[in-house]
């Protein structure tokens, strides 16, 4: 399963590299090195993947213990993460760069995909999406044939909480970028001035991260109807870890702000712009958490 997963990623990104090279807008004739590298990844990866994947499928079809093995569940859900996360990241890059160009900022100001093109992102989304669809359909078929679902349920639970944390991080970081923007002294224009890419990057993160987080959170909550989910130690551990992380960051942020205020009250001379710069990061982090 480990070799199958690695070879799958090798083939997938080899295809993405090949297609990006073929459809590159700024390259009329791709170099031989670029094409050779992409083709080598594909030609080496395909037979290795097929040998190990078909081997694993035959073993699962003939052995019920193999079919319900934890390592098989880990393969499926890890492979889904390795294909779906790039889909989300490339979609985020598309939105971020589109917003940046709309307000006439340099595309390099985009937090994600500043050096990429829309073709690069669409190719990555398409190829990873096709691979994820195949894996998802195969996983659904496996679920129908499971005689013991406990191992798969445990790994699926962990998979859901990885997405939950991933979406939450995008939301928090996006809100932090937007709030930090509010501390900047407005210049001649609201959007397009120095540092204003923060709010654009933050909005892009919120637009992508919020649906991911809300959907995953609803899925986790709906799963509580199952007795094993409601009593899961993993669920309690994730909730406590998120709560503790939020408390630690809020307390640390409050400490930084109090330090700045105490130094100001004790006579330190700080201009308004300098003061806002010092408190912008801790406050913008503390409020979302």
Where would I find each of the regions flagged by the language model?
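Hydrophobic/aromatic interaction determinants used to assemble and anchor large protein complexes
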Residues: 1-289
């Amino acid at each position: 399963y480990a070799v199958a997963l690695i070879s799958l990623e090798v083939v997938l990104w080899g295809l993405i590299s090949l297609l990006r090279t073929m459809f590159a807008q700024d390259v009329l004739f791709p170099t031989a090195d670029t094409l050779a590298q992409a083709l080598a990844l594909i030609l080496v990866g395909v037979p290795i993947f097929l040998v190990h994947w078909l081997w694993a499928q035959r073993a699962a079809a003939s052995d019920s213990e193999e079919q319900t093995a934890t390592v098989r569940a880990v393969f499926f859900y890890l492979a889904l993460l390795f294909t779906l996360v790039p889909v989300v990241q490339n979609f985020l890059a598309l939105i971020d760069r589109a917003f940046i160009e709309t307000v006439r900022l340099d595309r390099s100001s985009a937090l994600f995909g500043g050096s990429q093109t829309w073709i690069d992102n669409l190719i990555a989304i398409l190829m990873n999406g096709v691979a994820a669809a195949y894996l998802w359909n195969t996983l659904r078929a496996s679920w129908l044939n499971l005689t013991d679902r406990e191992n798969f349920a445990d790994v699926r639970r962990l998979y859901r909480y990885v997405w939950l944390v991933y979406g939450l991080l995008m939301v928090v970081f996006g809100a932090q970028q937007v709030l930090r923007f509010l501390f900047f002294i407005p210049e001649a224009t609201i959007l397009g001035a120095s540092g204003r890419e923060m709010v654009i990057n933050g909005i892009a993160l919120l637009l992508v991260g919020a649906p991911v987080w809300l959907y995953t959170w609803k899925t986790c909550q709906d799963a509580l109807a199952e007795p094993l989910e409601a009593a899961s130690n993993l669920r309690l551990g994730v909730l406590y870890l998120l709560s503790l992380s939020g408390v630690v960051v809020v307390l640390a942020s409050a400490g930084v702000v109090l330090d700045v205020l105490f130094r100001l009250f004790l006579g330190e001379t700080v201009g308004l712009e300098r003061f806002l710069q010092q408190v912008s990061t801790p406050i913008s982090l503390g409020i979302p958490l």
